[in-house]
Structure formats: C-alpha cells, structure tokens
Amino acid sequence: MTLGTEMSDNSLLSEDTDIDVVGDMGAKDGKYSDYHSDNDSDDNVARTPRGDPASPDLSSGSESNQRAEKSPKNALVKPPYSYIALITMSILQSPKKRLTLSEICEFISNRFPYYREKFPAWQNSIRHNLSLNDCFVKIPREPGNPGKGNYWTLDPESADMFDNGSFLRRRKRFKRQQSNEILRDPSSFMPAAFGYGPYGYNYGLQLHNYQQHPGATFSFQPSHCPLPPPASVFSSPTLSPFLGNELSRKSLYSQLSPTLPILHTLKPDAQSRPSFSIDNIIGGSGSTPSPTSPYTAQPGTHPPVIAMLSPSLAPMHNHLNLAHENLLPPGQNFSSKITNLNSCHF
C-alpha cells in the first residue's frame, strides 16, 4: 500500500532528527550564547556580547572641538550688577572716594571683560545714572586742579543702599532727605554773597527794610518830585524881591500829605518886619489876617507861584482878595488904620 510506504518514510525521518532539550545545540550554533545560567560565574566574566564592535566615537570628538572653539565667546557674559552698583564699586575702591566719569568707565572696563568689548556703548548709561540718582553727588573741580570733567562721590546717607552690603540687591531708590528749615526758606540754597533771592539775578530783589512812622496814613511814603530851578519859577517881574529871595531858600514841596498846609508861611525881610508893637499883638489875636500872611498881597495881583503850583487855588485866592477889599478902602491897609495907636502911652 502506498499508505504504508509513506508512513515508513516519515518514521525514518523522525529517527534521523534529534531534539535538543538541554540546549547544547543552541550553544553550539551560537543563537543563545548570550543567555547563561547563574552558576556559571566564569562564563559571565569571559563572555561579551557579539556584534558590539570596539570602534572609536568620532561624533563625540567633533562636539568637543566645537565646544572648545566657542568657550572664549561664552566667557563674555554680562555681569549681574546694575549700573548703580558698578559706579558704587568704582568709587569705593578709589583712595579719595571720588572719581570722574572717565575714571569710572576705566575701572569697569578693566574689571569686567564684557564691558571692555562693548565700550563705549554703555558710557552714556553711566552718565545718566550719575546725574539722575540722588545717591551720587557732583563735586566741582578745584581751580588749581587741571583736567576735564567734575568729580563724583557717594552721598554719606546712602551707605545702606544695598542689602547686607551685596551689590546684587538694592533695597530701594535712594532719595536725599531735606530738612524742614531748608524747605521753608528757599533762599538758603543761595550763597551769602548773592543778594538776589532764590531765583537768580534780577528776580525777587531784596528790598530795604522800611519802618513805618506812627503818624503816617499809608504804609508807604510818596516819592519826592524833582524841584525845578528857582530862576524858572520866579521869572515874573511882578513878584516882589523879598518873596523871591525867601522862596529860593526854601523847598517848594515838603511832602504830599493832606495834614500839611498848602504853602509855607513867608518871612519878610528884617527891614519890612515891624518891631514889637500893637500891630503884632492885635494881628496875632484878631480874626483878620496878619500883614505877614501870603493872602495880604496887593489887590488885583495874583502871585504866579500859586497859579503855577495849582490852578485850583487861583479862585480861592481871588475870593480872599475880594473879601479883603470889602473890609478896607482902596489904597489903605490895616497898619495905616492903627498908626495913631502907636503914639499912645499905656
């Protein structure tokens, strides 16, 4: 039978095929050489995985070369300090605790390579921080010290500006404190040599102290008018000689005050002045004006001085003359009426 022959052939094949149970075949072929038992300690040390070639790493070498080339550029890192801290460091390290702008920039450039490469791009920032912060005070250069630029120093009250002396942290913005007396009196900022007030020349001029008189009506005194020359005032030929001589020795304007009389009493010469007599006694006690009064001028004539000083006084002078003419007849005066009394003996 054909079936029997096939079965016989399969049996022959099965006898020739050997099954590896222990695993020696796998060890010989090399498929499971990586797997080993725990008891075989010698094989663990000696065996190495196959297919791992011991070739040098070329990629790691190229990366190390690139890092070496970039190392100088990475060293120029901006320092973690503000401009105020940099300026403070430069001033504190100086012997006199003051530096100019160029000296401050020189210190920063020598200390930090980053700013050395970036110079002078940051110089204006240093200048602005010096002028805008109250913790820095400008000191003018002495006349005998030649050079360019002013000195800069630290305000004594800004010593605790940084937290625990570390330049990395600043507590708060420093503001210069001013006393109340300085704020009340702005002129204290000005030197004593300048007498023009706190806002400079020709503004707020200091006036002289004025003492008010107790009898004055107003708190100010009116300015005196300039006096005209006597020759221009007394140029009229109708004025009597004694009147011109007397007025030329006196001031025409005393003070423009309503409490003073309009005109001073004129003094006649010694020749025309009567001696001690009844005329003086009656003239001082009576209601009629005395002969020495300015209103006893000749009727019909107007003194040019009164008309010149005030035109409003001329009608009043005419009224006084009319009243005087009504009392006495023309051509006579008061002294002629009492001439007979001088001969009487009492």
UniProtKB/Swiss-Prot annotation:
Query: Could you tell me which SUPFAM superfamilies the record lists for this protein?
Result: Winged helix' DNA-binding domain (SSF46785)
Does this UniProt record's set of keywords contain Mitochondrion? no
Question: Where, per UniProt, does this protein localize?
Answer: Nucleus
Task: Give me the positions annotated for DNA binding.
Answer: 78-172
A Gene Ontology MF term for this entry? DNA-binding transcription factor activity, RNA polymerase II-specific
Offer a single GO CC term for the protein: nucleus
Q: One GO biological process from the UniProt record?
A: regulation of transcription by RNA polymerase II
Instruction: Assign the protein's first listed, main location to one coarse class.
Output: nucleus
Name the segments for region: Disordered: 1-74, 274-304
Point to the regions of Basic and acidic residues compositional bias: 26-39
The domain of life for this entry's organism is: Eukaryota
Q: What Pfam families does the entry give?
A: Forkhead
Q: Provide the tissue specificity.
A: Absent from the notochord. First located in the neuroectoderm of gastrula stage embryos. Located within the paraxial mesoderm of neurulae, but not within the myotome. In tailbud embryos, strongly expressed in the developing somites, with levels highest at the dorsal and ventral margins. Beginning at stage 25, additional expression is observed within migrating ventral abdominal muscle precursors, in cranial neural crest cells surrounding the eye and in cranial crest cells that migrate to the second and third visceral arches. Also expressed in the diencephalon.
Q: Which InterPro entries match?
A: Fork_head_dom (IPR001766), FOX_domain-containing (IPR050211), TF_fork_head_CS_2 (IPR030456), WH-like_DNA-bd_sf (IPR036388), WH_DNA-bd_sf (IPR036390)
Cystine pairings recorded for this chain: none
Keywords recorded for this protein, A-Z: DNA-binding, Nucleus, Transcription, Transcription regulation
Keyword Transport assigned:
no
Provide ranges: composition bias, Polar residues.
1-14
Membrane-crossing residue ranges in chain numbering: none
- In this chain, composition skew of type Low complexity spans 287-296
What's this chain's function? Probable transcription factor.
The protein's name in its UniProt record: Forkhead box protein D2
Gene name of the record: foxd2
